[in-house]
Every structure is written in structure tokens, then in C-alpha cells.
């Protein structure tokens, strides 16, 4: 009975109703338009790849786009699209159909697939182009592209140039093999170099009318199928090695457990190989007779792919982060995706100009990678939403080096960034004054200028949400420390445009009275920096802050007393 309940639960969870939470909130017209556009894009990619050997998009983005199309078709019941291999169909029938392969999403899926299976083998999933090879009396006479799995195109014209492919067997036998033509690489580490467009390069070469000897020698062969070979995998591999295909045996490992599969997947992902790979293939050692094979995924073979180097992510929102100096940085908030075990929810575009050039809107699908294995990076827009949602962006001249010294409409982000810098390690180095604290004080109306916080007491601090009596006492201690900070540290906290190692001697009056020429006499200060310094000290907002600090008794800002001559 518990098994029946579990089956019923799994069935319910797989229904469209259960999946609805992840489905877009589109009306029927929009859903139809979005699906039609995605289908058209995929059809164009298929046509270029299968007919011209041109990959218009990275393989992993192609795969994820197909997954998205399948998901949308389930969400909105708009029917299914033609097979992506339809445009690959050719006139030449395969002696035995090429089976497909189911992709296992994670360790749990692999564990389920392996349950009850014995005699399982693991191989690298070579990232190339699948073919059928026909040998007669030991000589390679026919090379056929996978096509739709049943019919493909005749690539036999390339056989004379494929110097790295076994064209003459040591025995005069007739046999039919299936395998992968791949781009030969030296010491290729998939985890570091990625796919290197290896599959697309080989597809492009094979689509040509003629190859040069050098081009043909760049292509290798990995045999993974011998439909009419020995019944057991171990014997098939041994005979293939004797026939001139040693790599099949070298890169095939018998395994017993999920941990074995995970070990070899990780090993091949991070080891130097002569070809690009995009995962591992799991297959049972025994399989049905070749006469029963069909061009669809069978139960006895599956793929466990590597983590994506690029993730296809849906843009949920576009927000604009304003920094202390007025620099506007657009940030894309995306539906969470995973890259190398990192959960990505947002990615910076770097500049307002780049966002304007790319014109990214909510609903767009973008490619994201990791720069330096840690920082999310936008690669490009993959799909644009049919309906373009309006975005209100800051005007290019709204924020600059001397805007938003006070809290006002449209200024909160830059003003809080100024306060964060002031209290941070580059400024006064005040404990317990991070951006969250400043935001609470600003939103509570307790801090509206750069110096208001100097006048706060414990009672008023506790008016801000999340600030307890103890926290208020600790914050007051930090604020009191600020009063004794040196004059030059205060200037740097306010953002004076000068290098951290250059000296700032004197007081406010002396520095504010310097001309650009006088600033340039300081080693390390050129014409541009001197103009910025003059503008900083001359800004009315900065002068007002200096006056407030003088009134608060901060050293260096106070006007020195006049000496009276007797």
C-alpha cells in the first residue's frame, strides 16, 4: 500500500497543476506568441547546424532552450514541436538506427537509473558528431551522419582525408560501427577549457564539400557502438581494441555504484583528455539485439552531463544601483540558476551604456557564465521576450560626483552609498555602521545629511526599526570615535578625490584655497586630478558639510582663532 501512495503522489506532482507554479503568467495570446518565436529560433539553429555545419549558439544554450520549449509546451498545452533532428534527415539509411539517450539531471536521477541494473559501464560522453561507419573486407567504405537516427547524409567523400580515423582494419571483416567524430585536442581539461566549440568545429568541417589533409587529420574517432558485436561489453571492447579502436576500451570502466559513476565523471571532467566531453555515458553491458533498436532513448543507456558553463536565465527585473560617485550600474535579477554549484540570482551589467545597448527587459533569456569561477557575468541575450516591458532608468546626467549629498527624492541609493563609504574601512572605519544600518537610519528620517548622525542620541536611534537599546549604545560609541579621527581621514571619508597614499596636510581652509596649479605641485597629482580636487573643495554641498563639521568641533574643519597683535 505505501508504494501505491508514493506512486500516486509522484503522479500528482508531475501534473500540469503541480508545475503551474513555475509557469509564466501569460495570457493565451502571449503564450502562443512566445512559444512560436522560440520554435522559430530553434528551427533556424537546427537548419544552420545540420545543413551548413554552423553552430549559431553554444551547445549547452541550445539544450537549455529546448528544455525551456518543452516546459512551455507543457505549461500552455500548445502542442509539441517537430523533432530537432528533422532538418538533419538525409537520404542514406543507417544499417541500424542510432538510439537516443536520456539525460539524467542529478545524482538522484542517476541513482534511480542504476537501481536494479547490473553490469553497468561508464564512458566519457565525447562532444562531437555521431556517425555510422561501414567496413567491407576491413576497409572503411561508408560514413553516414546520424541525421534523424534512421536516415543521414553521406560523408564518405571525406574518408581519404581522415588520417586519424582507422580506415583499414587488420582483418578483412565486414562490420558496422557507431561512434563520434571529434576534434582532436591536446591535454584538454573540460573543467578549465569548456567545450571549445569542438562539436561545432567538426560539424562545420564535415559540412564542406572537401577537406584538406590537415583538416581531416584534426578529426578523431571514438567508437561507442557495435550493434552486431559480442553480447557483453567487455568482449566487445576487447575485440574493438584488436581491430584498431583502443580508445573504446581505454575509456570504458565497469562500475557497481553511484559513487563509482560520480568518481569517473569528476575524474574525466578535471583530467587531460584528447577530446572535449560534455558528461559521461552510462550503459548496461548487455543490450537487446540490434534488430530491436529504434531512434529513441532506450532503457539501457543514459547520460549524466557536466555542469553547464553557461546557464540560460530568465530576467525577472532590471534594477539600477547608484554608487557613491554617481556611477549607475544596472543589475539583472534573474530566475535562480546554478553554475558550478553556485546559485545565481543577479548579474551586473557594468554600465548604463551597456544596458542601453543591449536593451534587456524582464522576460528576456540571457546567457550567464562565471568569471574567474566566482563572479556571475552576462555573456549575451539569447531570446528576447515578445512583449517588451517598460523600464524606467535614471537619466544619464541625474547622478554625478556632486549629486545626492542629502536624502531627497531619487537620491536614496547614492546618499546611502556615501554614508557607507564614510563609515567603512576606506573612511572613518566605524564599527556597526554597514549599509543596512545607514539605510534604516535614512528610511526612519533620522539621517538626512552627511552629519546628522553626530547629533543622535540613544533614544532617537531606537526609533529606527531593528535597533535595540544595546545596539543604540554600541552605535553611539562608534559615533563618538569618529570625533577623534584625524582630519585627513575625515576628508577621505567624504570622498576627496585623491589617492590613499598621497598626503593631505593642513586644514580645511588651506586646502580649499588651493588652485589647480598648486595641487599639481604635489607629486602624483596631474591636471585631471587637480581639477577634480578644486571642484570638490568648491562644491557648495561639500562646503556646507565642512561648516557643519566645524560646528561639531571636528579637528581641521574649525576656523583657527585669530591672533590679536598687542
From Swiss-Prot:
Any one Gene Ontology molecular-function term assigned to this protein's record: DNA ligase (NAD+) activity
InterPro entries recorded: DNA_ligase (IPR001679), DNA_ligase_B (IPR020923), DNA_ligase_CS (IPR033136), DNAligase_adenylation (IPR013839), DNAligase_N (IPR013840), NA-bd_OB-fold (IPR012340), NAD_dep_DNA_ligaseB (IPR050326), NAD_DNA_ligase_OB (IPR004150)
Gene3D superfamilies: 5' to 3' exonuclease, C-terminal subdomain, DNA ligase/mRNA capping enzyme, Helix hairpin bin, Nucleic acid-binding proteins
Signal peptide extent: none
Record EC number: 6.5.1.2
UniProt KW keywords: DNA damage, DNA repair, DNA replication, Ligase, NAD
Enzyme class: ligase
Entry annotated with the keyword Chloroplast: no
Record's catalysed reaction(s): NAD(+) + (deoxyribonucleotide)n-3'-hydroxyl + 5'-phospho-(deoxyribonucleotide)m = (deoxyribonucleotide)n+m + AMP + beta-nicotinamide D-nucleotide
Domain of life: Bacteria
Listed GO biological process terms: DNA repair; DNA replication
PROSITE patterns: DNA_LIGASE_N2 (PS01056)
Residues the record marks as active site: 125
Listed PANTHER family: DNA LIGASE, DNA LIGASE B
Family the UniProt entry places it in: Belongs to the NAD-dependent DNA ligase family. LigB subfamily.
Protein role: Catalyzes the formation of phosphodiester linkages between 5'-phosphoryl and 3'-hydroxyl groups in double-stranded DNA using NAD as a coenzyme and as the energy source for the reaction.
Entry protein name: DNA ligase B
Upper taxonomic lineage: Bacteria, Pseudomonadati, Pseudomonadota, Gammaproteobacteria, Pseudomonadales
Gene assigned in the entry: ligB
Amino acid at each position: 500500500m505505501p508504494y501505491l501512495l508514493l506512486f500516486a503522489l509522484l503522479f500528482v506532482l508531475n501534473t500540469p497543476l503541480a508545475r503551474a507554479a513555475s509557469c509564466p503568467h501569460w495570457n493565451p495570446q502571449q503564450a502562443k506568441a512566445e512559444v512560436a518565436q522560440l520554435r522559430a529560433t530553434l528551427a533556424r539553429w537546427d537548419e544552420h547546424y545540420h545543413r551548413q555545419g554552423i553552430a549559431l549558439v553554444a551547445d549547452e544554450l541550445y539544450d537549455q532552450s529546448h528544455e525551456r520549449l518543452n516546459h512551455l509546451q507543457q505549461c500552455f498545452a500548445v502542442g509539441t514541436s517537430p523533432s530537432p533532428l528533422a532538418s538533419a534527415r538525409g537520404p542514406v539509411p543507417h544499417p541500424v538506427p542510432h538510439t537516443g539517450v536520456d539525460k539524467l539531471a542529478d545524482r538522484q536521477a542517476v541513482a534511480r537509473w542504476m537501481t536494479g541494473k547490473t553490469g553497468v559501464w561508464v564512458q566519457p560522453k565525447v562532444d562531437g558528431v555521431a556517425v555510422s561507419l561501414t567496413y567491407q573486407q576491413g576497409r572503411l567504405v561508408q560514413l553516414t551522419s546520424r541525421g534523424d537516427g534512421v536516415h543521414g547524409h553521406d560523408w564518405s567523400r571525406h574518408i581519404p582525408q581522415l588520417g586519424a580515423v582507422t580506415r583499414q582494419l587488420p582483418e578483412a571483416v565486414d562490420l558496422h560501427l557507431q561512434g563520434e567524430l571529434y576534434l582532436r585536442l591536446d591535454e584538454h581539461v573540460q573543467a578549465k577549457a569548456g567545450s571549445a566549440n569542438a562539436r561545432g568545429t567538426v560539424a562545420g568541417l564535415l559540412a564542406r564539400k572537401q577537406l584538406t589533409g590537415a583538416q581531416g587529420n584534426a578529426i578523431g574517432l571514438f567508437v561507442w557502438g557495435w550493434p552486431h558485436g559480442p553480447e557483453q561489453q567487455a568482449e566487445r571492447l576487447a575485440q574493438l581494441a584488436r581491430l584498431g579502436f583502443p580508445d573504446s576500451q581505454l575509456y570504458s570502466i565497469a562500475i557497481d555504484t553511484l559513487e563509482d559513476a560520480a568518481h569517473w565523471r569528476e575524474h574525466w571532467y578535471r583530467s587531460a583528455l584528447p577530446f572535449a566531453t560534455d558528461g559521461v555515458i552510462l550503459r548496461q553491458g548487455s543490450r537487446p539485439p540490434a534488430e530491436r533498436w529504434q531512434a529513441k532513448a532506450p532503457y539501457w543507456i543514459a547520460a549524466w552531463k557536466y555542469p553547464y558553463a553557461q546557464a540560460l536565465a530568465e530576467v525577472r527585473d532590471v534594477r539600477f544601483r547608484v554608487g557613491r560617485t554617481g556611477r549607475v550600474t544596472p543589475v539583472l535579477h534573474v530566475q535562480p540558476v546554478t553554475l558550478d554549484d553556485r546559485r545565481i540570482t543577479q548579474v551586473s551589467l557594468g554600465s548604463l551604456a551597456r544596458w542601453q545597448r543591449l536593451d534587456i527587459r524582464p522576460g528576456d533569456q540571457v546567457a550567464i557564465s562565471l568569471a574567474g569561477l566566482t563572479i556571475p557575468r552576462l555573456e549575451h541575450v539569447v531570446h528576447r521576450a515578445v512583449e517588451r516591458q517598460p523600464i524606467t532608468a535614471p537619466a544619464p546626467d541625474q547622478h554625478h560626483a556632486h549629486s545626492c549629498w542629502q536624502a531627497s527624492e531619487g537620491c536614496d541609493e547614492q546618499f546611502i552609498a556615501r554614508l557607507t563609504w564614510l563609515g567603512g574601512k576606506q573612511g572613518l572605519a566605524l564599527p556597526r555602521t554597514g549599509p543596512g544600518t545607514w539605510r534604516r537610519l535614512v528610511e526612519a528620517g533620522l539621517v538626512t545629511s552627511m552629519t546628522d548622525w553626530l547629533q543622535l542620541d540613544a533614544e532617537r536611534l531606537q526609533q529606527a526599526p531593528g535597533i535595540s537599546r544595546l545596539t543604540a549604545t554600541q552605535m553611539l560609541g562608534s559615533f563618538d570615535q569618529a570625533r577623534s579621527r584625524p582630519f585627513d581621514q575625515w576628508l577621505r571619508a567624504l570622498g576627496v578625490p585623491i589617492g590613499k597614499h598621497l598626503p593631505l596636510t593642513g586644514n580645511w581652509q588651506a586646502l580649499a584655497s588651493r588652485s589647480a596649479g598648486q595641487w599639481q605641485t604635489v607629486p602624483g597629482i596631474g591636471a585631471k586630478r587637480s581639477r577634480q580636487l578644486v571642484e570638490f573643495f568648491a562644491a557648495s554641498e561639500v562646503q556646507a558639510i565642512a561648516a557643519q563639521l566645524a560646528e561639531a568641533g571636528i579637528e581641521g574643519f574649525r576656523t583657527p582663532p585669530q591672533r590679536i597683535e598687542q
